[in-house]
């Protein structure tokens, strides 16, 4: 069944709080936040606000010097990883505003989506700071999303589910788009993230890694947002979660693992100490299993986390003053984990 975009002005609505729906509701479009149906959305909104940060807070002075000292392979990996992150946050900012939020009919969730779109724009600004501070290949990095055929192939696949929703906004396609967002936020960023942390573990590009830590913390809240929307929909519209749809979702995850593992191998070229092809593949498989289990779908791969040190590098729950000396003061800001929701 085709779903209509919500009205931006709807004074005739008599929808009560308990009648609110993830999509297909009849909201007034007023943000009456004294009445909340999805309490997790209110909690998440406050966490996102507490996590506010700005790219200029992160010093990139040492990174410019470090970049010049990177090996040719390390520079290629840095540029490729950054180019992919730039594309995904650009895509996601537009996707949320133009393609997802218009169909979501819960005001408390609308707020979270608008905040997420702001954060995707903030990430785009952070990447611009990184590119301008470090790389001599500014235009090359910004054009790589369509000029590098390996990257373009990945981007084409990522975008196709969103484009299908824009073309054919059925209930099933909305649900598939929510899963696609979960995959983007929970899988497609992580080869790039782990690459920056691997450099930082060797004492290189510490400012870049700190920027990525802030970005990843935001992405965790985005992942939780879509997982909670999926789980709420499972309660509201169990009829949509057919065996056929679940099988399609599992295939989406399998394809994502294949694409992201291949991308990670392309970034590292088999020449980055600490990130072998097999480690990257197992890491992405582990992430896929984790994401599937969070939305009530059985794990596919049954593998262990192969690079647990990445978690300590990305965590804001520990003061790593010897690693990120410039930003110890920010560790008091909001942190988030799956256990919070």
Curated annotation (Swiss-Prot):
Tetramer of two alpha and two beta subunits. GO terms for molecular function: metal ion binding; ribonucleoside-diphosphate reductase activity, thioredoxin disulfide as acceptor. It holds the Pfam family Ribonuc_red_sm. Fe cation 2 binds at residues 120, 185, 219, 222. It catalyses: a 2'-deoxyribonucleoside 5'-diphosphate + [thioredoxin]-disulfide + H2O = a ribonucleoside 5'-diphosphate + [thioredoxin]-dithiol. Binds 2 iron ions per subunit. It comes from Helicobacter pylori (strain J99 / ATCC 700824) (Campylobacter pylori J99). This is Ribonucleoside-diphosphate reductase subunit beta. It is an enzyme of class 1 (oxidoreductase). Fe cation 1 binds at residues 89, 120, 123. Provides the precursors necessary for DNA synthesis. Catalyzes the biosynthesis of deoxyribonucleotides from the corresponding ribonucleotides. Belongs to the ribonucleoside diphosphate reductase small chain family. NCBIfam families: PRK09614.1-3. Transmembrane segments: none annotated. Its EC number is 1.17.4.1. One of its GO terms (biological process) is deoxyribonucleotide biosynthetic process. CDD domains: RNRR2 (cd01049). Keywords: Deoxyribonucleotide synthesis, Iron, Metal-binding, Oxidoreductase. The active site is at residue 127. Its cofactor is Fe cation. It comes from the Bacteria.
């Amino acid at each position: 069944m085709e779903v209509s975009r919500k009205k931006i002005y709807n004074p005739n609505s008599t929808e009560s709080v308990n009648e609110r729906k993830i999509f297909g509701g009849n909201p007034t479009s007023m943000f009456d936040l004294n009445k909340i149906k999805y309490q997790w959305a209110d909690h998440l909104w406050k966490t996102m606000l507490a996590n506010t940060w700005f790219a200029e807070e992160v010093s990139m002075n040492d990174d410019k010097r470090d970049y010049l000292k990177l090996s040719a392979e390390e520079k290629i990996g840095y540029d490729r990883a950054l180019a992919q992150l730039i594309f995904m946050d650009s895509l996601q900012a537009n996707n949320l505003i133009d393609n997802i939020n218009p169909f979501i009919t819960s005001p408390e969730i609308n707020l979270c989506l608008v905040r997420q779109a702001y954060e995707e724009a903030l990430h785009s600004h952070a990447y611009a700071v990184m590119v301008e501070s470090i790389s001599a290949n500014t235009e090359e990095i910004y054009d790589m999303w369509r000029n590098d055929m390996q990257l373009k192939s990945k981007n084409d696949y990522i975008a196709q589910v969103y484009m299908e929703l824009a073309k054919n906004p059925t209930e099933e396609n909305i649900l598939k788009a929510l899963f696609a967002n979960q995959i983007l936020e929970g899988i497609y960023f992580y080869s790039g993230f782990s690459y920056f942390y691997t450099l930082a573990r060797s004492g290189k590009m510490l400012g870049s890694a700190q920027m990525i830590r802030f970005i990843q913390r935001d992405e965790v809240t985005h992942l939780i947002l879509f997982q909670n929307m999926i789980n709420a929909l499972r309660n509201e519209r169990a009829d949509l979660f057919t065996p056929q749809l679940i099988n399609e979702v599992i295939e989406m995850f399998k394809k994502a693992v294949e694409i992201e593992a291949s991308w990670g191998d392309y970034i590292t070229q088999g020449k980055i100490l600490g990130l072998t092809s097999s480690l990257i593949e197992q890491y992405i498989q582990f992430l896929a299993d984790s994401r599937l289990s969070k939305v009530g779908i059985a794990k596919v791969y049954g593998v262990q986390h192969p690079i647990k040190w990445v978690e300590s590098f990305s965590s804001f729950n520990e003061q790593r003053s010897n690693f990120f000396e410039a930003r110890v003061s920010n560790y008091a800001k909001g942190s988030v984990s799956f256990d919070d929701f």
